[in-house]
Amino acid sequence: MNRDNTKTNKTVKQEFASFTFVICIALVIRILIMEPFTVPTGSMKATILENDYIFSTKYSYGYSNYSLSFFDFIPLFKGRVFAREPERGDIVVFRPPNDMSVRYIKRLIGLPGDKIQLIDDVIYINDKKIERTEVGTYIGEDGIKYLKFKETLPNGRTYFSYKLAPIFGIISNDRYSNTGVFYVPEGQYFFLGDNRDRSNDSRVNLGFVPFENFIGKAQFIWFSTKITWWDNDIGIINLILKLKPWIESVRLSRIFKNLYNVDE
């Protein structure tokens, strides 16, 4: 009997040790290597849609206090360690300096020391306009029509941006299309959303983003749905009823999509 109890206790200890090891490995991966994020807004549409689930690499820019999951509100250190310089066109997850409780995802356009301006929707970097060509239209899932543009930055990075199509000849959001001049300070960066008319970015409330606030570089979409399923405000019965339409809303074509693929 005692022998059986000893064997049982040993098995429980082994299983607990294995479970603890797996949890530790998962935490190390999330803190230092790769972290999943859910995108709740359409500011990067149509590169990234609402309810896209993305993976970002934590090591791409080194590590700062804000990039360490679960420890980001503890002042462990200042600056970045193992820092690597970001590049124009990177899609970056970061904490906005005006609200450190949330995470933003935007495209990096301006580097420290740059002069940035938008004139008639065209980006000018250090008084030189980037290449920008209209390549078609995009109709969102909400039925809203966008003009689709292919843009190429000075480093050769190419991507698509989107602008609301004119309605009855009226062009929307002129304050987004024509801006003042922005001089990017040292150690800070200028960001834009690919959805140019519907993005809270460096043109308006966001301002410049310190390098220290970078969390990681967005790499690919690993899952995507048209609607959300989990909601803390609804009961278990409603969650069960919502499960089927949630499964049916999965965007299969977006699963494992590379965010830097411009062949589409």
UniProtKB/Swiss-Prot annotation:
Gene3D superfamilies tied to this protein: Umud Fragment, subunit A
Biological process per Gene Ontology, one example term: signal peptide processing
SUPFAM superfamilies (alphabetical): LexA/Signal peptidase
Membrane topology, Periplasmic segments: 40-264
InterPro entries, alphabetized: LexA/Signal_pep-like_sf (IPR036286), Pept_S26A_signal_pept_1 (IPR000223), Pept_S26A_signal_pept_1_CS (IPR019758), Pept_S26A_signal_pept_1_Lys-AS (IPR019757), Peptidase_S26 (IPR019533)
Subcellular location: Cell inner membrane
Membrane topology of this protein: Single-pass type II membrane protein
Bilayer-spanning residue ranges: 19-39
GO molecular function, one term: serine-type endopeptidase activity
UniProt protein name: Signal peptidase I
